[in-house]
């Protein structure tokens, strides 16, 4: 099986190299948010740290990284060009994300693979379609995700012992906040993983309430190990108060809303991308039992009530941001226009949202050796707190939840409707099919706006 992974990994790396080259040849102008990111990084490369573009919503982590990365490239290529000149080549800066995705991320997640029965293939984590697109653009998402996964891995494996691993994890977690502010929620989740791991080491599993009490006691007992994460939360609270909000700039377009339906969007994306992991006849039977047959049919009443609640949320807590309606360079524009904004969509989406919500929670709770009930609650709670306040329907916000979900959910052993195929291999081919499709659309489907004549537009997540 290892040889299969080597072959498939080689195929994916070669594919990424080809795509990067094609993007470099065809996307010669900064694309969407790259306009701000590239310009700000180039400003930092000129050592003008006093200049800041107030349209940028995230901290300067990407620009500091880009500046350092460009300096490293300059030195290892022995170029006589200045740092400013190197940074003016936007493909050099773009390659920082490709390096992160193909080198750094695999090294981190490989340490989380269980040797006897691997719960995932490293190449599949790297090939996730929501990540894949941004390996070739200068966006914050890749390194924001890498640093959170690195922080998580240190807490889970503790290669340097409890205290040292926790403090390094906390430092890396702090660095992740310089790329995306909402990572503060995932820092709290990582802290819950640490405490729960310690709880299981020192206490037998008992009832949920007693486990919760033991969790709190363990957090107090291990306060020294938890301190780096508490410090991050305190520092972030100070930042929010001083900054008068979470976003750095463009605050008018990023006001907080109660966008509860975003949870259903997230769970639907997560279920769609991970179907090779969970889809089985046994799961379908379990869902039917949960919705209709369970408790002598009483579950039917609960299901009807859930459906009514979902419709209420759709009708009252769907936020339609002006960007969603105006920007046809994102898949969400077409998802909204052709699916979610159709007549009766608030009816036919109910069973989809119901199933996807149940599926995510069910697959987490049925994974032996995965998350415990306590950390499932902190994970789901993290998703809620991260995405519900956001007015934007933005799949990039689902990257970290999807990564964590996939790191912990083990593929079912059941055949795919009677067909004998490795679930990991099926997942790889599914991801590759999606990656190829979004690459073809991105490179081949070109259009222009009347407001920007001659400037080629493309479609991404």
Curated annotation (Swiss-Prot):
EC number: 2.4.1.256
Membrane topology of this protein: Multi-pass membrane protein
Pfam families named among the record's database cross-references: DIE2_ALG10 (PF04922)
Keyword Transmembrane attached: yes
Gene Ontology molecular function terms on file: dolichyl pyrophosphate Glc2Man9GlcNAc2 alpha-1,2-glucosyltransferase activity
InterPro entries named in the record: Alg10
Cellular localization per UniProt: Endoplasmic reticulum membrane
Ranges annotated as spanning the membrane: 6-26, 92-112, 119-137, 138-156, 159-179, 220-240, 260-280, 290-310, 344-364, 368-388, 425-445
Coiled-coil segments on the chain, per record: none
Recorded superkingdom: Eukaryota
KW Endoplasmic reticulum (keyword) present: yes
GO biological process: dolichol-linked oligosaccharide biosynthetic process
Residues with attached carbohydrate: 316
Keywords: Endoplasmic reticulum, Glycoprotein, Glycosyltransferase, Membrane, Transferase, Transmembrane, Transmembrane helix
Pathway(s) per entry: Protein modification; protein glycosylation
Function: Dol-P-Glc:Glc(2)Man(9)GlcNAc(2)-PP-Dol alpha-1,2-glucosyltransferase that operates in the biosynthetic pathway of dolichol-linked oligosaccharides, the glycan precursors employed in protein asparagine (N)-glycosylation. The assembly of dolichol-linked oligosaccharides begins on the cytosolic side of the endoplasmic reticulum membrane and finishes in its lumen. The sequential addition of sugars to dolichol pyrophosphate produces dolichol-linked oligosaccharides containing fourteen sugars, including two GlcNAcs, nine mannoses and three glucoses.
Family: Belongs to the ALG10 glucosyltransferase family.
Name the UniProt record assigns to this protein: Dol-P-Glc:Glc(2)Man(9)GlcNAc(2)-PP-Dol alpha-1,2-glucosyltransferase
């Amino acid at each position: 099986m290892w040889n299969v992974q080597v072959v498939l990994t080689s195929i994916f790396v070669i594919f990424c190299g080809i795509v990067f080259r094609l993007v470099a040849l065809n996307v010669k102008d900064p694309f969407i948010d790259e306009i701000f990111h590239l310009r700000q990084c180039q400003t930092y490369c000129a050592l003008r740290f006093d200049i800041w573009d107030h349209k940028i919503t995230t901290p300067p982590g990407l620009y500091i990284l880009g500046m350092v990365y460009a300096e490293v490239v300059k030195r290892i290529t022995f170029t006589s060009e200045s740092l400013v000149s190197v940074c003016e080549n936007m493909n050099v800066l773009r390659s920082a994300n490709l390096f992160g995705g193909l080198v750094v991320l695999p090294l981190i997640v490989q340490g989380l693979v269980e040797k006897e029965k691997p719960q995932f293939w490293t190449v599949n984590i790297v090939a996730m379609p929501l990540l894949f697109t941004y390996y070739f653009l200068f966006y914050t998402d890749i390194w924001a995700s890498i640093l959170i996964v690195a922080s998580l891995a240190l807490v889970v494996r503790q290669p340097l012992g409890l205290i040292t691993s926790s403090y390094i994890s906390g430092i890396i977690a702090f660095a992740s906040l310089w790329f995306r502010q909402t990572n503060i929620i995932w820092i709290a989740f990582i802290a819950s993983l640490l405490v729960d791991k310690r709880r299981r080491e020192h206490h037998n599993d008992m009832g949920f309430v007693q486990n919760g009490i033991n969790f709190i006691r363990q957090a107090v007992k291990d306060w020294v190990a938890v301190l780096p994460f508490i410090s991050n939360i305190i520092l972030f609270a100070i930042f929010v108060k001083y900054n008068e909000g979470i976003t750095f700039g463009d605050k008018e377009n990023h006001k907080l809303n109660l966008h509860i339906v975003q949870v259903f969007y997230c769970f639907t994306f997560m279920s769609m991308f991970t179907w090779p992991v969970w889809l089985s006849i046994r799961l379908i039977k379990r869902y039917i039992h949960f919705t209709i047959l369970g408790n002598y049919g009483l579950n039917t009443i609960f299901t009807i009530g859930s459906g009514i609640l979902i419709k209420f949320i759709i009708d009252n807590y769907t936020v339609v941001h002006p960007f969603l309606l105006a920007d046809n360079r994102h898949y969400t524009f077409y998802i909204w226009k052709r699916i979610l904004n159709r007549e009766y969509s608030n009816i036919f989406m109910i069973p989809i949202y119901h199933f996807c919500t149940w599926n995510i929670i069910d697959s987490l709770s049925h994974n032996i050796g995965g998350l415990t009930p306590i950390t499932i609650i902190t994970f789901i709670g993290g998703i809620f707190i991260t995405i519900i306040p956001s007015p934007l329907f933005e799949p990039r916000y689902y990257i970290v939840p999807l990564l964590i979900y996939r790191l912990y959910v083990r593929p079912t052993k059941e055949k795919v409707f009677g067909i004998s195929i490795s679930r990991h291999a099926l997942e790889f081919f599914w991801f590759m099919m999606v990656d190829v499709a979004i690459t073809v659309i991105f490179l081949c489907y070109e259009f222009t706006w009347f407001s920007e004549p001659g400037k080629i537009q493309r479609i991404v997540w």
